[in-house]
């Protein structure tokens, strides 16, 4: 039974995904349909959570816009996601960065990972 499910899911996996983790700053290009037009909307922020495996894997991106924190959760293999760009690698020691929700301003920054 598992082999059947795995073979069906195989065709829906995205192959061109970059490697990223919590603390990384990413740009997510999302396809948005407005009426009959389809355009790309860019959501840039810090990855605070990655959960799940396989097709159901999701990641949450947080950004602060004019003092208001906005979090968006994206399915990793969704056809609505055109592409994901990693702009910065963050150095963190946690898998879930929920503590960033209470921090504002410069305190909410994540250190950049060394280039070695």
From Swiss-Prot:
<dbReference type="GO" id="GO:0022625">
    <property type="term" value="C:cytosolic large ribosomal subunit"/>
</dbReference>
<dbReference type="InterPro" id="IPR018257">
    <property type="entry name" value="Ribosomal_bL19_CS"/>
</dbReference>
<dbReference type="GO" id="GO:0006412">
    <property type="term" value="P:translation"/>
</dbReference>
<comment type="similarity">
    <text>Belongs to the bacterial ribosomal protein bL19 family.</text>
</comment>
<dbReference type="InterPro" id="IPR008991">
    <property type="entry name" value="Translation_prot_SH3-like_sf"/>
</dbReference>
<comment type="function">
    <text>This protein is located at the 30S-50S ribosomal subunit interface and may play a role in the structure and function of the aminoacyl-tRNA binding site.</text>
</comment>
<protein>
    <recommendedName>
        <fullName>Large ribosomal subunit protein bL19</fullName>
    </recommendedName>
</protein>
<keyword id="KW-0687">Ribonucleoprotein</keyword>
<dbReference type="InterPro" id="IPR001857">
    <property type="entry name" value="Ribosomal_bL19"/>
</dbReference>
<keyword id="KW-0689">Ribosomal protein</keyword>
<dbReference type="Pfam" id="PF01245">
    <property type="entry name" value="Ribosomal_L19"/>
</dbReference>
<dbReference type="InterPro" id="IPR038657">
    <property type="entry name" value="Ribosomal_bL19_sf"/>
</dbReference>
<dbReference type="GO" id="GO:0003735">
    <property type="term" value="F:structural constituent of ribosome"/>
</dbReference>
